[in-house]
């Protein structure tokens, strides 16, 4: 995997698109009504900027995509897989930690807030596992920023430790009775 701190490869993309979130409610709210329910409204001075960004994208005739009922993350992940299937490489420009699960060969992540490409070490430092296992870690630990509950008492660090030991969430749940720590074992079994 290419671990570069340079942004030189961002300067000449062959294709690109600006991906927007749709309205606040998405299909995830149909699955889990409290999804992102803890989010406060954006600051008043930020709200008008959303429309300015959309207008700027339109004024510069930049390709953009948004789809009702979907978040930008969903669209980015879908387009990434479609592009990889065609044998092309992908660079995602975003500071969203949830997109780290897309990091792999031929997919680079550039964090504009940190002005650097995300490396495999960055992913492991953040989640304690490789990108393919992030979803298992988040399933166990939950995601407070999205108001998604996990197993009580299991944070990212313990979730990563368990996933690294048992390889997948499914295997962990199948072998939960083998967990040595009584409280942890009981909590995971109770919350299957």
Where is each model-derived feature located?
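Non-catalytic, usually N-terminal nucleic-acid engagement modules in DNA/RNA processing proteins
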Residues: 1-21, 27-30, 34
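Extended two-metal-dependent nuclease catalytic cores across DNA- and RNA-processing enzymes
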Residues: 37-192
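Short, active-site-adjacent cap segments at secondary-structure transitions
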Residues: 24-28, 98-101
């Amino acid at each position: 995997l290419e671990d570069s701190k340079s942004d030189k490869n961002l300067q000449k993309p062959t294709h690109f698109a600006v991906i927007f979130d749709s309205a606040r409610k998405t299909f995830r709210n149909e699955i889990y009504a409290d999804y992102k329910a803890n989010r406060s409204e954006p600051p008043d001075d930020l709200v008008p900027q959303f429309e300015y960004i959309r207008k700027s994208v339109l004024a510069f005739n930049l390709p953009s995509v948004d789809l009702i009922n979907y978040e930008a993350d969903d669209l980015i992940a879908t387009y990434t897989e479609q592009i990889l299937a065609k044998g092309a490489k992908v660079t995602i420009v975003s500071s969203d930690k949830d997109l780290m699960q897309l990091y792999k060969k031929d997919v680079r992540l550039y964090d504009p807030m940190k002005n650097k490409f995300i490396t495999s070490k960055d992913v492991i430092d953040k989640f304690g596992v490789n990108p393919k296992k992030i979803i298992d870690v988040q399933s166990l630990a939950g995601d407070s920023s999205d108001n998604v509950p996990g197993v009580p008492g299991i944070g990212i660090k313990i979730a990563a430790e368990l996933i690294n030991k048992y390889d997948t969430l499914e295997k962990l749940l199948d072998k939960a009775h083998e967990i040595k720590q009584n409280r942890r074992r009981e909590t995971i079994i109770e919350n299957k």
